[in-house]
Amino acid sequence: MNILVSGATGFIGSHTCVSLLEEGHNVIAFDNFFNSKENVIEHIKELSGRDFVFYNADMTNQDDMEKIFSENQIDCVIHFAGYKAVGESVQIPLSYYHNNIYGTLCLLNVMKSHNVKKIIFSSSATVYGNPASLPIKEDFPLS
C-alpha cells in the first residue's frame, strides 16, 4: 500500500514510518520541521533498511499538498501533522487554528480531488486530562 504520512519526522510519525516500511509498505512522507529535525529522515532509512519519498512541505500550503498528490499514487493518509502543546495553544490559538484546522482542511481537499478516501487521524492523549489509571480504555470520558 502507498501511504502518505504527515508530520513524518515527529516522534510518532517517524516511528510509524519505520513500522510501515518494515511491513513492506511504500511510504510517502512530509514534514515542515516545525517541531522536528531533518536528520530524522536518515534515521528512518537506517532503522527500516529502506528508502522512501520525502517532501519538506507544509499542509497549510495547498500547492505543497497538490504537488505531493500529483507526483504519487496515494492509497491512504496517516495524519500526525498537528500542533499539540496545550499551554501554547491557549497563548497563540490562531496559530493552532491555522495549522490544525485550516491545514487539515487543505489536506482533506487535496485528498478529495485525488480520490483518496482513507485517512487515519492521530489526536493527542491530552484530550483525556489526567486519568486516575492507565491504560486509558476506549470508553474513557474526554476532558
Go through each PLM region and give its residues.
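N-terminal Rossmann-like NAD(P)+-binding domain of SDR-like oxidoreductases, especially those catalyzing
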Residues: 1-143
